[in-house]
């Protein structure tokens, strides 16, 4: 039964819930805030589909190119680039898709900015909600069935998600679908929704107001500052960077509240599951400092469909050919596993009693000397050179 899957394997893609023909699979959220499947034995008809199709128990094969064309890219629209997490390539590809009458499926924040889920949309308003990375797990319950229905009705769909969610969708549908276009990203690992909610709750308490807008990896102090920017209903603003924000400390440096299975991800590999793969072009050489501060995406063109998507958006993109080695120089998580450094179980126990920042501080503290060295390097490289834009 799928409910006996080990926690360090299950990706939480929720595809087994959608594929079960008798509605026997549901999900239980554990104390780490991550969900895992449960099976109602009375409803289960023992067809075995959940196990046969699970992308964590069976690697989903891909015919995509194992040596894809690699580009550095960004949107030519300054606002789109500013509002996006990297260079805004997702927005331009999805906008062109909507303009041709297609549906987009991706991740949005809940109205209180404390959880995230996958939805299907067709308008620019939908696109504005879907753009931007949310660095914690999105709830995908029902999305596989909804996409399947649209495809059966002859509609075109552009799905974007983590590589394991893309693998789950491909496994659910069973064969390559002409009308389905797939996007994924280089994925370090996904975080616990409970940790993220606790992080926002604490900041709301400190600012005595509820959140109106959250931007992770805000460009206000430059792309490389990895800052979180939060606007509150009372008009106040929170803006902290990689050295001062406890979420970034726990995730970027410690992988402290990441889903357990992400330490042994099956999809950090080539060929990719999706038609296009996006990422951050960290460490890119030969671009101006201004461009680096505005954000630069890496794009892998993994298939003919990927090439079609790029062609459709090309008039709104800056695109230059680069190599895989250049990407690997600055992006270890394309192939490398993210290893958790702090004490994860203690962190989640503490989180039940203490504010988020205290739980991070007490279970993960970076060596002070390393931190000091990184901070001085950052100041020398960016702060003195930074331009306002
Ligand atoms: C959890 C996570 C880890 C990542 N790790 C890396 C990394 O190690 N290296 C790297 O180069 N890039 C990483 N990225 C990708 C990077 O942050 C950008 O999303 C990517 O470069 C595309 O940028 P963009 O500006 O074009 O688009 P954006 O506007 O940022 O892209 C938005 C698209 O991403 C999807 N998305 C956003 N959040 C989620 C989510 N929680 N779950 C599923 N789909 C989501 C949305 O549906 C939307 O379609 C990660 C992204 C996420 C969400
Ligand atoms: S990886 Fe996905 S399909 Fe497999 S058990 Fe976990 S939630 Fe279900
Ligand atoms: S690291 Fe792998 S398993 Fe974890 S969310 Fe990303 S693609 Fe899925």
Each language-model region and where it sits:
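Iron-sulfur cluster-binding cysteine motifs and their immediate structural context
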Residues: 2-9, 15-32, 36-38, 48-66, ...
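Local cysteine-cluster metal-coordination motifs and their immediate loop/turn environment
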Residues: 8-22, 45-57, 162-168, 257-270
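Short, flexible loop segments at boundaries between secondary-structure elements
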Residues: 181-202
